């Protein structure tokens, strides 16, 4: 009997292999599909990144019955991918997507979006300095010592992303889809919690908060894996 297919879409800075390393144990239960998006090692640099274009790029990976999971910028991509090809989606999970526009009017979300706009429009143009500013903003650890070539490539790709805080998420289309949704945050940021709370309400999604790893909730390993596995298995049983 084939295992459920789980497509794991990584976000900014690091590739799929690095983002989802703690999810490798799930390969005993599911077919894990972990692409490295364009602009990330081992591929070359890119001139621009667009979440809607990235959603279309996922089309060949979305076989019928796919469970789509996205972290951060990958969560924004996953939302568009699921709305684009709902007939292929068995479930949708997003982890702290920076879709700040859905929570417009929330003070924390508005402040985060303004800070991101300032960083991208007027921040440092040197990749390492830019990445330090970004990691600080999302409450992620800053590596000690010199940044690796892979991180610097991730920083260059980060700098040319289409702004996710301006994304107009297709909430009505997604709310009308029959597949279950799960929204996860790390309990470290009022802005990300606000986004996730709106997605829970507007999409009729399940909601979970897993503290301890900041923005990179999936790096918790077993607690996240058990949450995701239980959700996928419930979706399979529907």
Please tell me what each predicted stretch does:
Residues 31-67:
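Active-site loop/oxyanion-hole signature of alpha/beta-hydrolase fold enzymes
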